[in-house]
């Protein structure tokens, strides 16, 4: 069903795919704020499912709130309208950033108070509600997950509150001391990218008759604080060092987000199950980054 020839990468010129991604399959310039452009790509390639990943990350969004809304919400509206007209399914991810300080901090249930205090979070809650609206009113097959912090060796992090959990592995492989922007003891849910990609595919493949929820499912894999990931790395690099230099904006975001999510509904409704825990991810990250960086 899938494969390089069956996935079309939409991009804007300032963020054109490079390297392996550029060579992996068809790609089209496609600005999410331009509904006609989206429709042209959908028609040209006979697209039946749209993975709408266009968004500013949490820290960047706080500095450019109007642009964050334009991309995240006006863009989503365009995607949903095209999907309604051309009978496409739509996956638009939400995030742990959709929660706020009034949310229960531990094992957050699927349905609970959200009330985020960042434009990133406000836009994610709006994304969930607007996606559900299009499903109920127009029958558009919308589905989503609330992603934890995502960790990957492929793409460098940039502009997110949870980026430290990726940056720390780069420092470890390079033999550098890591300067952590998040305070000791601040737990957040995290997930390795292979699990995140699998979740995005498996949810869209799931039997719709089993889905009580749609936008958006809690999914979880691991929850740790900076000391936890430090200890995991030191099992394989005992000389690795870390110090703290807390960045106020990132810390404020982290303080308003929950420590962990309860993903029972995802497990029950579409058989979600993560494959990577902290140790398994650490082994793979260190191996893959060592090869990538030539260390």
Positions of PLM-derived features:
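C-terminal substrate-binding subdomain of Rossmann-fold SDR/epimerase-dehydratase oxidoreductases
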Residues: 181-183, 189-295
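Conserved glycine-rich Rossmann-like NAD(P)H-binding loop of the short-chain dehydrogenase/reductase
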Residues: 2-17
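SDR active-site strand-loop-helix element
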Residues: 10, 50-56, 90-96, 145-147
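Conserved Rossmann-fold NAD(P)-dependent oxidoreductase catalytic core, especially the SDR/UDP-sugar
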Residues: 52, 77-119
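Active-site YXXXK catalytic motif of short-chain dehydrogenase/reductase
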Residues: 72, 120, 124
């Amino acid at each position: 069903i899938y494969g390089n020839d069956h996935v079309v990468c939409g991009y804007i010129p300032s963020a054109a795919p490079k390297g392996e991604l550029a060579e992996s399959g068809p790609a089209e310039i496609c600005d999410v704020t331009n509904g006609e452009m989206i429709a042209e790509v959908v028609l040209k390639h006979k697209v039946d499912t749209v993975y709408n990943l266009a968004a500013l990350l949490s820290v960047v969004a706080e500095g450019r709130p109007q642009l964050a809304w334009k991309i995240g919400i006006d863009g989503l509206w365009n995607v949903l309208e095209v999907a309604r007209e051309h009978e496409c399914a739509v996956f638009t991810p939400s995030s742990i950033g959709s929660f706020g300080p009034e949310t229960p901090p531990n094992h957050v249930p699927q349905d609970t108070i959200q009330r985020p205090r960042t434009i990133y979070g406000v836009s994610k809650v709006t994304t969930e509600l607007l996606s559900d609206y299009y499903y109920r009113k127009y029958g558009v097959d919308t589905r989503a997950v609330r992603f934890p912090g995502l960790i990957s060796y492929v793409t460098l992090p940039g502009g997110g509150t949870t980026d430290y959990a990726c940056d720390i592995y780069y420092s470890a492989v390079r033999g550098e001391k890591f300067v952590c922007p998040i305070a000791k003891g601040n737990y957040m849910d995290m997930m390795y990218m292979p699990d995140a990609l699998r979740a995005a595919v498996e949810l869209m493949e799931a039997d719709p008759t089993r889905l009580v929820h749609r936008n958006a499912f809690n999914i979880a894999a691991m929850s740790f604080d900076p000391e936890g990931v430090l200890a995991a790395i030191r099992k394989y690099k005992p000389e690795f060092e870390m110090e703290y230099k807390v960045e106020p904006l990132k810390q404020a975001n982290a303080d308003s987000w929950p420590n962990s999510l309860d993903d029972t509904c995802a497990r029950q409704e579409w058989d979600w199950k993560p494959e990577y825990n902290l140790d398994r991810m650490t082994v793979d990250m260190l191996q893959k980054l060592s090869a990538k960086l030539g260390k």
